[in-house]
């Protein structure tokens, strides 16, 4: 399973979820689903925006986990 590491990256960079929410300009519902890995898809433009805002390569936004670790 692939999941987004947004919360971990925010913690590493000492930013809040609210800070990122304001930067992303998404509805809170869509933003929260993305951040909490409750979505099955994400738009490429949102990935690009995340990468720029968090100043990290797109690949760093993801991690692969075993299904048992859910």
Each model region followed by its residue ranges:
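The alpha-helix within a helix-turn-helix
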Residues: 10, 21, 51
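Short, basic-rich loop-to-helix N-cap that marks the start of a DNA-contacting helix
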Residues: 39-49
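Short alpha-helical DNA-recognition segment
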Residues: 15-33
